From Swiss-Prot:
This is Uncharacterized protein SCO2128. Pfam families: ArsA_ATPase, ArsA_HSP20. InterPro entries: Anion-transp_ATPase-like_dom, ArsA_HSP20-like, ATPase_ArsA/GET3, HSP20-like_chaperone, P-loop_NTPase. PANTHER family: ARSENICAL PUMP-DRIVING ATPASE ARSENITE-TRANSLOCATING ATPASE, ATPASE GET3. It comes from Streptomyces coelicolor (strain ATCC BAA-471 / A3(2) / M145). Belongs to the arsA ATPase family. GO terms for molecular function: ATP binding; ATP hydrolysis activity.
Amino acid sequence: MRTLLITGPGGTGRTTVAAATALTAARQGTRTLVLGTDRDDTLGAALGVRTGPAPTSVEPGLTAWRPDAAQGFRDALAALQDRAASALDLLGAARLDPQELTPLPGADDLALLRALREAALAEAHDLLVVDLPPAPRALALLAAPEELRRALRRLLPPERQAARALRPVLGRLAGVPMPTEALYEAAARWDLELAAAESVLADRNTVVRLVAEPGPAGADAVRTTTLGLALRGLRTDLLVANRVLPEDTPADSWLSGPLAQQRKTLEEWRGAYDVRAVAHLGHDPRGTDDLAALAVPGVNPDASPVEWPVTDRLAEDGVLVWHIPLPGAVREELDLVRRGDELAVAAGPFRRTVPLPSALRRCTVDGAALRDGTLAVRFAPDPELWPRGR
């Protein structure tokens, strides 16, 4: 199954483009599911049908689904209380009525990750189009599975679970209670769910498509978003320049100024991205006829994979070089920190800690340089760890 994640700056029509992309694919014979994320039914408004917690058939080959984050939160709370029933009874605590609660901050994102996993693992469709939130929130959402799994491993290392029988003894010796079996079981469940979502994002059939309105603000947002996606190793296929004004706009029209800005930005974008322009219809698209009139680009089956290759230059320079693509990065906004077998990379407002390839774990960082949008990190072999004879 192919997965197309669509995001961009807020207010640039990403939901409309997601709906139109799904419609185009369905009419080309691809069984398509479009997944909405807004609490307001903006996806349904674009498609001309109401969407909600139950999948809705828009037309043959196209289904729309907008998960209910609030209901998912209530269901999760009920399940948690069921598992902790004995502890609650022991404490004399009254159970919370799920209907009286509203979702906590972040519940929407967790619900979307769960829905993304469920939809991608199902076999009912060939293409999943996801209308992600605006770019800043989308980047945090896409980073969540990896970051949360890393935090779980640090807080509750799996290898410590082997000492189940020793926990009561260790607790008495330390004078503090040790983590209970239930805590480790909950962590294992969370890790399993997060791993499934992470595998969908890392799959070779998953790509991100950016939508932006050409102009100064759009250009800045695209540059920042592209950098954030690159640091996460996520593939992008196209940049959709949305709401492009007609070229035959009269010179004395008030639209001539915005058109000039769009032309300038489009020229810059075409030098850096695979850009597809989508015309402004003169009104907000509503319904499948309007979506078809947009003539959005179809799904690109040949998006290039993201690679972070290691180059062996031991014979020439005595180093191994790790190449990390970071388009749009600025040298003054880069930072690297080596921590054991991991490398923390900061680029602009983004940060990621990545495990080192096995060969580089036996090396020390020897420097780094940013050239043509690629960060080249040099590693020198550690004589105490590097095999003799190399």
